[in-house]
């Protein structure tokens, strides 16, 4: 690929994640985007367990059974001359670690909000990570087909709770059973809800921004209310500011209904136009790697075992940051200095795959992994070793002791634990004295998924013994004395052999600090 071709290819890319609180409609809008991208012909409903239809992005059996996303899926398609990479993230709060890591691999985020509920806790958490990264955030106020809160109230709440300017790009004309359409502020037209002519769902507006000609909607109170609201936000609202959007200080707000596929196409067309192409990535050496740099580089943000249960494979997901990835490329793994040839690579449509021959900045490539990679690894072709910024790691809050139910199946038990831990699906610790396995998780559902996958993917039933909620704190190995351990502060080591204590409660932690003031206790995120 010539430098000009590389630049053109990079400028076509739009790589983003969809974030939301559970049940705000994230998976439904993902499906509708795939529908417009020609990837699927019919949108499934993630809740439709009885109908046997499942969301394309929910490919793991447990996701289909429970109607939730527990892993990040990657989907790619072309639309309006752009190459779209969607990273669908787990909506369930117990899987925030996977979601946070995914947000490190995107150039923008789409925040889906239930217009009946407004800003919810998980939305707030994920928004903070996007804000911290300074990436553009686009808002889709969903479920307009149901009665919800007033649009002005929703925007006011968003601005107050998330500390970001909101800029409405369209405006609802009614909602629920009174939903008539969307006033497209940017394009000066009205998109009708359930129009008589589906091929042309738009109403033209006159120079004053009102419906041209005769139309019964003119006399409808929801239309006049919408005009009043639009006049108000025109005078007192925030002006559209691309510079503020680029830095994550302003969010364009679109209203619609993913379930009825209303307003989604308008959103997609605006998004591909407004969202950024891949930009420079910061390294730990505090240098910037430009996407058009001729040397290939990328980082691994996710590892997934058993995407194809028939082959028991393991895929490392790489975000390409610069240069061109080609099949058979020779790269260096920065962490070990090891050189390797990447012959087996793939691109995704959830669990469906195709061999990838070429990829550029913004693309997500799957590498078949035999155990070489870890989450956070950097690979590159340049002479100078580089390491991209570290991915966030979290302090677990819940812990369980885990053992194999059948002692004759120790091999599959150990393999399953090793692979699921390397995925980042759960955290693993060993006790110093007995080498018992202790699992750490952010939420209870992680344990359930771990237990399910051990049984169904590794044929290893496990016994999970709760040791309760504990406070995990790491210490300097040089300060460690095993006599510090007790039943109230369990001494364990992580997968990097770093020592830490699992304190029974805050009181136990304070008691320890008073007794050993010279020992510094640290937490992850």
UniProtKB/Swiss-Prot annotation:
InterPro entries reported in the protein's UniProt record: EF-G-like_DII, EFG_III/V, G_TR_CS, P-loop_NTPase, PrfC, RF3_C, RF3_dom_3_sf, RF3_GTP-bd
SUPFAM superfamilies: EF-G C-terminal domain-like, P-loop containing nucleoside triphosphate hydrolases, Translation proteins
Keywords recorded for this protein, A-Z: Cytoplasm, GTP-binding, Nucleotide-binding, Protein biosynthesis
Record's signal peptide: none
Superkingdom of the source species: Bacteria
Residues reported to bind GTP: 20-27, 88-92, 142-145
Keyword S-adenosyl-L-methionine: no
Start and end residues of each tr-type G domain: 11-279
Record-level GO BP terms: regulation of translational termination
Location in or out of the cell: Cytoplasm
One Pfam short name: GTP_EFTU
GO cellular component: cytosol
Record-level Gene Ontology MF annotations: GTP binding; GTPase activity; translation release factor activity, codon nonspecific; translation release factor activity, codon specific
Broad class of the protein's primary localization: cytoplasm
Function, in words: Increases the formation of ribosomal termination complexes and stimulates activities of RF-1 and RF-2. It binds guanine nucleotides and has strong preference for UGA stop codons. It may interact directly with the ribosome. The stimulation of RF-1 and RF-2 is significantly reduced by GTP and GDP, but not by GMP.
NCBIfam families, alphabetized: prfC, PRK00741.1, small_GTP
HAMAP family associated with the record: Rel_fac_3
Family label: Belongs to the TRAFAC class translation factor GTPase superfamily. Classic translation factor GTPase family. PrfC subfamily.
Name of protein: Peptide chain release factor 3
Organism of provenance: Latilactobacillus sakei subsp. sakei (strain 23K)
Lineage: Bacteria, Bacillati, Bacillota, Bacilli, Lactobacillales
């Amino acid at each position: 690929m010539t430098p000009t071709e590389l630049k053109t290819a990079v400028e076509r890319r739009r790589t983003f994640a969809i974030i939301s609180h559970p049940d705000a409609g994230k998976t439904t809008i993902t499906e509708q985007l795939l529908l417009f991208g020609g990837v699927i012909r019919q949108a499934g409903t993630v809740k439709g367990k009885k109908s046997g239809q499942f969301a394309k992005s929910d490919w793991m059996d447990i996701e289909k059974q429970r109607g939730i996303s527990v892993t990040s899926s990657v989907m790619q398609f072309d639309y309006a001359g752009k190459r779209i990479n969607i990273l669908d993230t787990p909506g369930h709060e117990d899987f925030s670690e996977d979601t946070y890591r995914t947000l490190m691999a995107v150039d923008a985020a789409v925040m889906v909000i239930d217009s009946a509920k407004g800003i919810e806790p998980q939305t707030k958490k994920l928004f903070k990570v996007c804000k911290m990264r300074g990436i553009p955030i686009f808002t889709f106020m969903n479920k307009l087909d149901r009665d919800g809160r007033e649009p002005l109230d929703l925007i006011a709440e968003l601005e107050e709770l998330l500390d970001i300017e909101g800029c409405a790009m369209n405006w609802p004309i009614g909602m629920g059973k009174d939903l008539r359409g969307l006033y497209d502020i940017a394009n000066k037209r009205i998109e009708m809800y359930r129009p008589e002519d589906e091929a042309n769902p738009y109403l033209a507006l006159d120079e004053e921004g009102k419906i041209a000609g005769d139309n019964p909607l003119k006399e409808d109170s929801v239309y006049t209310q919408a005009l009043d609201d639009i006049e108000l936000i025109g005078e007192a609202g925030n002006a559209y500011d691309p510079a503020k959007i680029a830095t994550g200080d302003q969010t364009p707000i679109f209203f619609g209904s993913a379930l009825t596929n209303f307003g989604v196409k308008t959103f997609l067309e605006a998004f591909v136009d407004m969202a950024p192409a891949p930009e420079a990535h910061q390294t730990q050496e505090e240098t910037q790697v430009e996407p058009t740099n001729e040397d290939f580089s990328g980082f691994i943000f996710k590892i997934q075992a058993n995407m194809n249960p028939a082959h028991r494979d393991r895929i490392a997901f790489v975000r390409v940051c610069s240069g061109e990835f080609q099949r058979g490329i020779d790269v260096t793994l920065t962490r070990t200095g090891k050189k390797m040839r990447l012959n087996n690579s793939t691109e995704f449509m959830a669990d469906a795959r195709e061999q990838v021959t070429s990829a550029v900045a913004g693309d997500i490539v799957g590498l078949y992994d035999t155990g070489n990679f870890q989450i956070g690894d950097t690979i590159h072709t340049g002479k100078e070793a580089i390491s991209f910024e570290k991915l966030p790691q979290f302090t677990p809050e819940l812990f369980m002791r885990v053992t194999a139910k059948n002692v004759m199946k120790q091999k599959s038990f150990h393999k399953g634990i090793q692979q699921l831990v390397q995925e980042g699906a759960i955290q693993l610790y060993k006790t110093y004295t007995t080498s018992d396995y202790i699992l750490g998780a952010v939420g209870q559902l992680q344990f359930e998924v771990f237990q399910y996958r051990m049984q169904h993917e590794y044929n290893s039933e496990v016994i999970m013994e709760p040791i309760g909620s504990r406070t995990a704190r790491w210490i300097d190995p040089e300060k460690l004395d095993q006599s510090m351990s007790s039943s109230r502060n369990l001494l364990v080591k992580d997968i990097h052999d770093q020592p830490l204590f699992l304190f029974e409660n805050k009181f136990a932690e304070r008691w320890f600090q008073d007794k050993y003031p010279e020992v510094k206790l640290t937490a992850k995120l």
